[in-house]
Amino acid sequence: MRYLQKGQSVARTGEEPYSIAMMLKDILPAPYTFKITASDISLKSLMVGQKGFYPESRIGGIPEKYLERFFTKTNGGYQANSEIMDTIHFDYHNLMHDSGLRNLDIIFCRNVLIYFDEAAQLSVINRFWNSLGPKAYLFIGHSESLFGMNTKFEFLKTDWACLYQKNL
């Protein structure tokens, strides 16, 4: 069995980790498995994600094939099923402290760094570096950049993401 360990930096109310999990379930062939750690500083947001229930108004961009496979339509919304919920662990975490996670393959931290000053950003980025395994990836938001920061990450040019790779 091959295992992909994926770190999700910001859970919010779970939409992003569930979306990533659905895509991975769709594209990863057997024998690959994965586990997502979805973290946030808001306990209220984490509770929404753990429940896995979303009103129809929040389901907008999910492809029909994913809704049919990973959700059950209920009165007023959709409930994530165990196939997808079992891939995600929701955890309270403040990015200003070390998570203790190591050898992650991917970290998604979109639209969070913009809320920190440069010193705090660098501190968070260094913690991400320590959490990632060799040749692992860091995705950040389009409005964010590591440009001009003294980091060891290598920018990978793509048309679709702000992507960095950990190089040793």
Where are these regions (language model features)?
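Conserved class I S-adenosyl-L-methionine
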Residues: 2-14, 35-37
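Conserved SAM-binding loop of SAM-dependent methyltransferases across substrates and taxa
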Residues: 13-30
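Short, well-ordered alpha-helices that flank and scaffold nucleotide-derived cofactor binding pockets
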Residues: 22-26, 51, 130
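Short conserved AdoMet
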Residues: 29, 54, 133
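Extended basic-aromatic, gly/pro-enriched interface segments that bind polyanionic ligands
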Residues: 32-108, 112-115, 120-123, 146-147
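Core SAM-dependent methyltransferase catalytic element
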Residues: 106, 149-168
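A short glycine-rich, Lys/Arg-flanked "PGG" loop and its adjoining helix->strand segment in the class I
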Residues: 122-134
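Conserved beta-strand signature within the Rossmann-like core of class I S-adenosyl-L-methionine
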Residues: 134-142
